[in-house]
Swiss-Prot record:
PANTHER family according to UniProt: RNA M5U METHYLTRANSFERASE (PTHR11061), TRNA (URACIL(54)-C(5))-METHYLTRANSFERASE (PTHR11061:SF30)
Source species taxonomy: Bacteria, Pseudomonadati, Pseudomonadota, Gammaproteobacteria, Alteromonadales
Keyword Iron-sulfur: yes
Family classification: Belongs to the class I-like SAM-binding methyltransferase superfamily. RNA M5U methyltransferase family. RlmC subfamily.
Name assigned to this protein: 23S rRNA (uracil(747)-C(5))-methyltransferase RlmC
Organism: Shewanella baltica (strain OS195)
Underlying gene: rlmC
Gene3D superfamilies associated with the record: 2.40.50.1070, Vaccinia Virus protein VP39
CDD domains with a match to the protein in the record: AdoMet_MTases
Residues annotated for [4Fe-4S] cluster binding in this entry: C12, C20, C23, C100
A single GO BP: rRNA base methylation
């Protein structure tokens, strides 16, 4: 990234007018944002860093400060004849976010087209204040490898499906890059993004992405990183760090669609991936098959329960953990300490819970830490930490 881009300040009309404050640090240069995040990380991990060992903190990895996001979660507001895709502003107004700077230009254009789609279909937006209407959210995910899309309509009931199906052929003819379309039924009058029922309106049910020549698949309910540019560097770094230990066996806990494990896998490595979301596991299995990996097992289980059910004899050479914001928890920390693999690679989206977990992982020391700025203009970031057995 050039210094000119790093030191520029993004001018966002939504933020300047107080309509959307999600990117709370957008008026700071990206370099300054990353410096603050780095200092936060240093302070949190200071208790685990030996004196004169600052070199284990590697330079932070950054990407573009606009056009990087691959997922849009749009609240549908307004009325059927004049829908608005975006958010409710702090003052309570409906704000159209189709031109949000975080989205690539082609994604912005498609969001505008989807606004017209809602209008043409006559889909009444759900009114929270009156508990009436049908269309709650439009969720759009973009694959960078081909610029293809997964489109989801979140409805209160089945009543709007026929209207969507009526207008869908024209939309798909205009945008053949929309490969997956589904309807999610969320009948509850609560601030819940999605329900249990997913109805596919296309034959294809998954979107293909590719990082560092590793095929990954996205289904409607599977978690996927929202910043492909930096995520690819995160996975590649993990691959390089793990390779230094030449493991013959790996566990990838909280594996999602398998991004970390599949990057580190080879035909000589036995890989076990654990993830509670069955859709994500189905995606990981598909990737492994496409890569021709045979010594791979992905299972839809709770990671902590999986570890509790294993004995020391089952331990792998190396364990990867990539938990949600809550961290891995004390019970799993204890299991990892008892298994005592050669190394533990911890990818964290919440350095506070990373620090808390490090207190409970016994018999290990940090050898490398690196910050990945997957979430520019916010307080959030990803951390990769390598722990090696004492």
């Amino acid at each position: 990234m050039s210094a000119a881009i790093v030191n520029a300040v993004k001018q966002c009309g939504y933020f300047n007018q107080g309509q959307c404050l999600s990117c709370r640090h957008i008026q700071q240069p990206l370099a300054q944002q990353v410096a603050v995040k780095t200092q936060t990380l240093l302070q949190l991990l200071a208790p685990f860093i030996p004196a004169n060992s600052a070199e284990l903190f590697l330079p932070p990895i950054t990407g573009d400060d606009s056009g990087f996001r691959n997922k849009a979660k749009m609240v549908v507001l307004g009325a059927a004849h004049e829908p608005v895709l975006g958010i409710v502003s702090p003052s309570g107004e409906a704000v159209d976010l189709c031109d949000c700077l975080l989205y690539p230009a082609d994604m912005q254009a498609l969001l505008h087209r989807l606004t017209r789609f809602v209008q043409q279909a006559g889909l009444p937006p759900y009114r929270v204040d009156k508990a009436k209407g049908e269309l709650k959210f439009i969720l759009l995910t973009r694959s960078q490898v081909r610029g293809e899309y997964l489109l989801r309509f979140v409805l209160r009931s089945h009543n709007g499906i026929e209207r969507i199906e009526r207008e869908l052929p024209a939309l798909l003819a205009e945008y053949p890059q929309i490969k997956v379309v589904s309807v999610n039924i969320q009948p509850v009058h609560m601030a819940i993004l999605e329900g249990d029922e997913e109805i596919f309106l296309t034959e294809n049910t998954r979107l293909e992405e590719r990082f560092n020549h590793v095929p990954l698949f996205i289904r409607p309910k599977s978690f996927f990183q929202t910043n492909p540019q930096v995520a690819a560097q995160l996975y590649q770094t993990a691959r390089e760090w793990v390779a230094e230990f030449s493991p013959r066996s790996l566990w990838d806990l909280f594996c999602g669609v398998g991004g970390f494990g599949l990057h580190c896998a080879s035909k000589d490595i036995t890989l076990t991936g654990i993830e509670i979301e069955a859709e994500a596991i189905a995606c990981a299995q598909m990737s492994a098959q496409m890569m021709g990996l045979e010594n791979v097992q992905f299972m839809a289980l709770d990671s902590t329960d999986f570890a509790k059910g294993k004995s020391a004899a089952d331990k792998p050479d190396l364990i990867i953990v990539n938990p949600p914001r809550r961290g891995i928890g004390e019970a799993l920390c204890q299991s990892l300490s008892e298994f005592a693999p050669k190394a533990i690679l911890y990818s964290s989206c919440n350095p506070k819970t990373l620090a808390k977990d490090l207190e409970h992982i016994q018999g290990y020391h940090l050898t490398k830490v690196q910050l990945f700025d997957l979430f520019p203009h916010t307080d959030h970031f990803e951390v990769l930490a390598m722990l090696v057995k004492d």
